[in-house]
C-alpha cells in the first residue's frame, strides 16, 4: 500500500503546482511579456529535469545493473571451481595430489590413480626392502634436482605472473566493453523518446492540415495583395500626373492674377483634397475596388471650387503628388501588415496548440515513468523506495509549473469538460499511480536495465520538447528582448538546481 500512497502523492504534486498559478492568473489582465517569461522559465525547468535528474539517474541504474551482472558472473565461477586433495599411504610413502572438480580429465586421472594404489600387494614382495630401495632412489633424485629447483621455481613464477598479467588485461578489456554496452541502454531510451514524439507531432501536423506551411502562405498572399494594390495606386498617380501637367499650363498663365488671400484659400482646399483622397483610398483598398477608387478620387478633385485652378502652380502640384504617393504607400503597408498579422496570429495559435498537445503527451509519459520508477525502487527495498518517491514528489513540482505556463501563454480558456485545462492536469496526475500499478501487478517490477531505458525515454521526450518546440517559439517571438528570454531560461535552470540542492541537502 505504501507504493500507491507515494504514487498518489507524486501525482498530486504537479496537480497543485499547475492549478494554483493557472487559476490565479487566468482572469487577470497581465501583459503578454509575463506569459512569455513564464514560457522561458518552463523551458529551463524542462531541460534541467532532463539533464540533471533523468539522464544521471538512468546512468546510475545502468551502472548498478552492470555491477549486479558482474557479481553474478563472479559467484558462478566461484561455485563451479572447487579443489579436491587426496592423500594415499603405501607403507611409509604418502601420495598427495589436488584435483579441480570441474575438470573431467582430472577426475578420470584421480580415479585411475586411486585404483592403482588400492590394488592388493604382490605375493613374496617384502615391503621393507621396497621402502629402502625407494628411499635410496628418492635421495639420489633429490640430490640431482636440488640445483634445478631454484631455476625452475623462478621460471615458473615468471610464467605464472606473465599469465596473470595477460589474463588481467583481457578481463579488464572485456569488463570495459561490457560496461559500455550497459551505458548504451539510456541512450537507446533517449533516441526512442525522440522518435515517438516526432511521430506524434507529425500526426497532429497532418490533422491540422500542415500548420507549418500556413505561415509561408500567409506571407506570400500578403505580398500579392500589396503588389496588386500598388498597381492600382501607381495607375492612379500616373493619371493624376497627366492631369496635373495639363493644369500646370493654365496655372502658369494665371500666375499674375494671384494674391495673398487666394494662397490661404488654396492651402485650405489642398488639405481638404488630400484628406478626401486618403479616406477614399483606404475605403477602396479594403474593398478591392480599383476602378471605383480612381472615379471617387477624380470626383473629389472635380467637385473642388474653381478658386484652386488659378492659383495652383507647379510646385503645389508636385507637393500634392508626393503627399498622395506617400499616403497611398502607407495605406498599402498598413493593410498588408494587418493581413500578415492576422495570418501570423492564426499560425501562432496553431503552433501553440500543437506545442501544448505535444507537451501534454510528454508530461504524461514522464508521470507514467515516475510511477514505474517508484514501483521498481520499492521492489529493491522499502527504504530506497521511500527516498526515491520523495525525490520524485519534489521534482514533479516544476512539471506542473511547465504545463500551467504553456497553457497560460495561449490565453484561451474554454469551459467545456474536455477543453478545460484542469481536465488535463488531472490526467497527468493519474498517470503516476497508473504506472505504479502496471509495473507492480502486471510486470512484477522492472529490472535495473529496463528502468534505465525508461528513464532515458523520459529524458528524450523532454529534450525534444525543449529543443524543437519551446525554444523556436521563444526565439521567434519579439514580445521581449532575446537577452531577457535567455536570462529567463537560465533562471528556470537555476531554479531547479536550487530545489534539487535543498532536497538533497535535507537528506
UniProtKB/Swiss-Prot annotation:
Region (Disordered): 124-179, 209-264, 305-350
Database matches in Pfam families: Zip
Keywords attached to this entry: Glycoprotein, Ion transport, Membrane, Signal, Transmembrane, Transmembrane helix, Transport
GO molecular function: zinc ion transmembrane transporter activity
Gene Ontology biological-process entries: zinc ion transmembrane transport
Residues glycosylated per entry: 31, 240, 298, 328, 342, 351
Record's compositionally biased regions (Acidic residues): 138-154
Membrane-protein topology: Multi-pass membrane protein
Record's compositionally biased regions (Basic and acidic residues): 155-179, 317-332
Signal peptide: 1-18
Compartmental location: Membrane
TM region(s), chain numbering: 35-55, 185-205, 355-375, 388-408, 422-442, 451-471, 486-506
Gene Ontology cellular-component annotations: membrane
Superkingdom of this protein's organism: Eukaryota
Biased segments, Low complexity type: 125-137, 221-258, 333-350
Membership in a protein family: Belongs to the ZIP transporter (TC 2.A.5) family.
Its job: May transport divalent cations. May participate, with dstA, in the regulation of the differentiation of stalk cells during development.
Name used for this protein in its record: Protein zntA
Source organism: Dictyostelium discoideum
Species lineage: Eukaryota, Amoebozoa, Evosea, Eumycetozoa, Dictyostelia
Amino acid at each position: 500500500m505504501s507504493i500507491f500512497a507515494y504514487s498518489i502523492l507524486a501525482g498530486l504534486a504537479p496537480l497543485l503546482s499547475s492549478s494554483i498559478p493557472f487559476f490565479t492568473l487566468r482572469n487577470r489582465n497581465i501583459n503578454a511579456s509575463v506569459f512569455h517569461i513564464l514560457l522561458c522559465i518552463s523551458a529551463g525547468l524542462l531541460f534541467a529535469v532532463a539533464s540533471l535528474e533523468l539522464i544521471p539517474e538512468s546512468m546510475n541504474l545502468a551502472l548498478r545493473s552492470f555491477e549486479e551482472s558482474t557479481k553474478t558472473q563472479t559467484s558462478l565461477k566461484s561455485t563451479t571451481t572447487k579443489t579436491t586433495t587426496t592423500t594415499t599411504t603405501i607403507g611409509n610413502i604418502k601420495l598427495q595430489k589436488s584435483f579441480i572438480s570441474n575438470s573431467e580429465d582430472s577426475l578420470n586421472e584421480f580415479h585411475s590413480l586411486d585404483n592403482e594404489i588400492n590394488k592388493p600387494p604382490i605375493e613374496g614382495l617384502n615391503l621393507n626392502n621396497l621402502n629402502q630401495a625407494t628411499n635410496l632412489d628418492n635421495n639420489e633424485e633429490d640430490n640431482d634436482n636440488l640445483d634445478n629447483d631454484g631455476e625452475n621455481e623462478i621460471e615458473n613464477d615468471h610464467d605464472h605472473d606473465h599469465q596473470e598479467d595477460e589474463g588481467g588485461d583481457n578481463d579488464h578489456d572485456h569488463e570495459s566493453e561490457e560496461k559500455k554496452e550497459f551505458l548504451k541502454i539510456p541512450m537507446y531510451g533517449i533516441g526512442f523518446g525522440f522518435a515517438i514524439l516526432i511521430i506524434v507531432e507529425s500526426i497532429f501536423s497532418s490533422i491540422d492540415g500542415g500548420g507549418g506551411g500556413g505561415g509561408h502562405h500567409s506571407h506570400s498572399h500578403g505580398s500579392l495583395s500589396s503588389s496588386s494594390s500598388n498597381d492600382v495606386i501607381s495607375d492612379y498617380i500616373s493619371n493624376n500626373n497627366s492631369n496635373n501637367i495639363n493644369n500646370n499650363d493654365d496655372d502658369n498663365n494665371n500666375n499674375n492674377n494671384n494674391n495673398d488671400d487666394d494662397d490661404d484659400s488654396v492651402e485650405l482646399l489642398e488639405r481638404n483634397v488630400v484628406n478626401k483622397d486618403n479616406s477614399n483610398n483606404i475605403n477602396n483598398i479594403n474593398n478591392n475596388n480599383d476602378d471605383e477608387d480612381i472615379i471617387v478620387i477624380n470626383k473629389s478633385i472635380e467637385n473642388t471650387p474653381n478658386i484652386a485652378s488659378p492659383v495652383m502652380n507647379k510646385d503645389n502640384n508636385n507637393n500634392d503628388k508626393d503627399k498622395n504617393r506617400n499616403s497611398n504607400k502607407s495605406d498599402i503597408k498598413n493593410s498588408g501588415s494587418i493581413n500578415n498579422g492576422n495570418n501570423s496570429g492564426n499560425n501562432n495559435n496553431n503552433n501553440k496548440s500543437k506545442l501544448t498537445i505535444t507537451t501534454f503527451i510528454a508530461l504524461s509519459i514522464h508521470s507514467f515513468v515516475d510511477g514505474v520508477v517508484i514501483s521498481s525502487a520499492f521492489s529493491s527495498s522499502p527504504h530506497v523506495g521511500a527516498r526515491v518517491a520523495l525525490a520524485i514528489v519534489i521534482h514533479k513540482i516544476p512539471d506542473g509549473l511547465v504545463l500551467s505556463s504553456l497553457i497560460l501563454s495561449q490565453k484561451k480558456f474554454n469551459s467545456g469538460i474536455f477543453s478545460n485545462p484542469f481536465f488535463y492536469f488531472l490526467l497527468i496526475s493519474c498517470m503516476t499511480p497508473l504506472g505504479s500499478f502496471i509495473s507492480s501487478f502486471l510486470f512484477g517490477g522492472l529490472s535495473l536495465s529496463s528502468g534505465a531505458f525508461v528513464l532515458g525515454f523520459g529524458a528524450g521526450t523532454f529534450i525534444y520538447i525543449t529543443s524543437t518546440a519551446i525554444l523556436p517559439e521563444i526565439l521567434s517571438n519579439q514580445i521581449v528582448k532575446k537577452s531577457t528570454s535567455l536570462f529567463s531560461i537560465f533562471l528556470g535552470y537555476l531554479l531547479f538546481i536550487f530545489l534539487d540542492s535543498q532536497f538533497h541537502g535535507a537528506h
